[in-house]
Design a protein with these regions (language model features):
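The feature captures the conserved acid-bearing segment of alpha/beta-hydrolase catalytic domains
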Residues: 164-234
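Primarily recognizes the serine-hydrolase "nucleophile elbow" in alpha/beta-hydrolase
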Residues: 126-191
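Alpha/beta-hydrolase active-site loop signature
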Residues: 59, 85-89, 179, 204, ...
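Bacterial N-terminal signal peptides
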Residues: 7-15
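Glycine-rich His-Gly loop
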Residues: 54-59, 145, 201-202
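Sec/Tat signal peptide C-region and signal peptidase I cleavage site
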Residues: 17-21
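Alpha/beta-hydrolase-fold serine-hydrolase catalytic core, especially in secreted/extracellular enzymes
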Residues: 234-235, 241-283
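Serine-hydrolase catalytic machinery in alpha/beta-hydrolase-like enzymes
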Residues: 27-134
Length: 283
């Protein structure tokens, strides 16, 4: 039996009808489990495309949520892989919520060290698969909510779960990042060395606070490595997760991400531009 199973489909990704290939890929993990994934391939690129891995939030899947970001990155010339984290997907979240209620159920999942260890194996499986296709010249990890926690952990943030990683990416993008609380101590972000873009919204509420609490992750980062914080007026938690993403927020979020990453790929820290309804900070 083949260890790697590919299911190919074609999806209309652009409003004007331009088609991009989409692969459903089952990636073999180091522990023998399978990581279901969706690969968004760029239409045309010279050589090997840069790589972006996408990590969903608690209760998400490879098919729900961050599709909008995968599509945008593919249009921008990236190979984007949306990972399906089974150990922190919807069935697991429902089980925790039935046992402990809504708030405590989510808290139980986002503080489960084993769930993050499984996510790290998902990430390693995707990196191994992508490397077998070609050597990506630039690698980025992006995530939303629990996926943003995963991003911070992979980048080297201190944490209360006893987790360590090897920081295999050139840059990171955190949508709805977590501030200090049940996962991160107040000095969590100081060890992070890589460039990072953080995006939140004024209605982006979390377990331990609102957008100002989320912004503390940016405050905790050191300066000098192209760190940006973007705050979108009126944007909610679900907007960034893609489950309730109005075109207005979709356009702004994907534009920020692609502009930031394109600048880094070209060898400089981009100068993002503030606009009505968008507040930016950098260091």
């Amino acid at each position: 039996m083949k260890k790697l199973i590919l299911h190919f489909s074609t999806l209309l990704l652009l409003p004007l009808g331009t088609a991009h290939a989409q692969q459903h890929v089952d990636l073999p993990r180091a522990d023998g489990a399978i990581t279901p994934s969706i690969v968004y391939e760029p239409k045309a690129v010279k050589g090997c495309a840069p790589l972006a891995l996408l990590s969903h939030g608690a209760g998400g899947s490879e098919e729900r949520g961050l599709r909008y970001l995968g599509e945008a990155l593919a249009r921008d010339g990236w190979r984007a892989i949306a990972l399906g984290h089974r150990e922190s997907g919807l069935p697991v979240l429902r089980k925790d919520m039935r046992a402990e209620g809504f708030h405590d159920g989510i808290a139980a999942l986002v503080t489960d060290a084993d769930a993050y260890k499984a996510r790290f194996m998902d990430i390693d499986a995707a990196l191994k698969w992508s490397e077998a296709q070609c050597h990506a010249p630039y690698k980025v990890l992006a995530g939303h909510s629990m996926g943003a926690i995963t991003v911070m952990l992979e980048a080297g943030a201190r944490n209360k779960l006893g987790l360590t990683t090897h920081g295999a990416f050139d840059a990171y993008v955190a949508l709805s990042p977590e501030g200090p609380g049940i996962v991160f101590p107040t000095d969590a972000w100081q060890p992070i060395k890589a460039p990072m873009l953080l995006i939140t919204g004024t209605k982006d509420k979390g377990l331990d606070g609102d957008w100002t609490w989320r912004s503390q992750a940016f405050d905790g980062l050191g300066s000098g490595a192209c760190r940006w914080l973007a705050v979108l007026d009126g944007a909610t938690h679900m907007n960034f997760g893609g489950l309730d993403l109005a075109d207005h927020y979709k356009t702004r979020t994907t534009s920020l991400v692609t502009q930031y990453l394109d600048g880094l790929r070209s060898g400089h820290c981009p100068s993002l531009s503030a606009a009505p309804g968008l507040v930016l900070r950098s260091k």
